[in-house]
C-alpha cells in the first residue's frame, strides 16, 4: 500500500490522488455573470450537496497552480452573489469539457461549448437548457482555504429554485 503525507507531494500529484480517491464525482457546471452582464460557465469537480433544510450546495474554485490566480467564476460571485449550478450528465461531457478551457474574461463559454443559455426565474445568471437539473442559488459565504496555487475557495450556496427535467 502506498503511503504519503500530503505536504510531501507536489500539488499536481496530490490533486490527482485526491480526485481519483473519491468517485464517481458529480460535476457542477456553474453559471455566473460579471457586473457588466457577461456570462461565464465553468465546471467544478469539487462539488456536492451538504444540507437539505436549508438546501445547501458547495463547490470550490481552486486557485490556479501555475500562476496562483483565481477563476472568473470566483471573481464574479464575489461581486454578484448568485450562481446556477447545472448538473452534468454523460450527454454533456464533451460540451462541459469545452467550458473548462482558458478563455479571455469576456468570452462566452455558452457559445464556445454550444450549450443553450436560458433565463433563470429568481436570479441573474443563466441556466444551461441541456442540463437535467438546474439549481438557482444565492451565495451565502465564500471561505478561502489558502493563498497558494491549488488552494480551494468553498462557495456555500443556498438553493432557492430547482428545475428538474422529466
Q: Which sequence ranges carry the predicted segments?
A:
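Active-site-proximal mixed secondary-structure blocks
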Residues: 1-42, 48-166
Amino acid at each position: 500500500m502506498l503511503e504519503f503525507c500530503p505536504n510531501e507531494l507536489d500539488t499536481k500529484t496530490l490533486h490527482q490522488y485526491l480526485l481519483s480517491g473519491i468517485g464517481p464525482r458529480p460535476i457542477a457546471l456553474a453559471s455566473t455573470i460579471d457586473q457588466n452582464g457577461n456570462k461565464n460557465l465553468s465546471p467544478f469537480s469539487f462539488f456536492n450537496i451538504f444540507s437539505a433544510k436549508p438546501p445547501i450546495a458547495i463547490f470550490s474554485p481552486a486557485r490556479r497552480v501555475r500562476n496562483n490566480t483565481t477563476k472568473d467564476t470566483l471573481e464574479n460571485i464575489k461581486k454578484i452573489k448568485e450562481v446556477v449550478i447545472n448538473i452534468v450528465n454523460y450527454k454533456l461531457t464533451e460540451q462541459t469539457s469545452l467550458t473548462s478551457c482558458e478563455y479571455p474574461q469576456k468570452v462566452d463559454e455558452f457559445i464556445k461549448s454550444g450549450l443553450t443559455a436560458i433565463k433563470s426565474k429568481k436570479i441573474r445568471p443563466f441556466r444551461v437548457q441541456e442540463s437535467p437539473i438546474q439549481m438557482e442559488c444565492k451565495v451565502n459565504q465564500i471561505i478561502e482555504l489558502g493563498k497558494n496555487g491549488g488552494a480551494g475557495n468553498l462557495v456555500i450556496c443556498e438553493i432557492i429554485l430547482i428545475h428538474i427535467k422529466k
